[in-house]
Amino acid sequence: IVGGFTIGIDTVPY
């Protein structure tokens, strides 16, 4: 993921 949150799994693909 680029420029987002990664909590265990990619969340909010910002």
Swiss-Prot record:
Family that this chain belongs to: Belongs to the peptidase S1 family.
Protein name as annotated: Cocoonase
Keywords: Hydrolase, Protease, Secreted, Serine protease
EC number(s) recorded for this UniProt protein: 3.4.21.-
Main location as per UniProt: secreted
Organism from which the protein derives: Limulus polyphemus (Atlantic horseshoe crab)
MF GO annotations: serine-type peptidase activity
Subcellular location: Secreted, Extracellular space
Reported function: Protease that shows preferential cleavage after Arg and Lys residues.
Sequence ranges assigned to domain Peptidase S1 in this UniProt record: 1-14
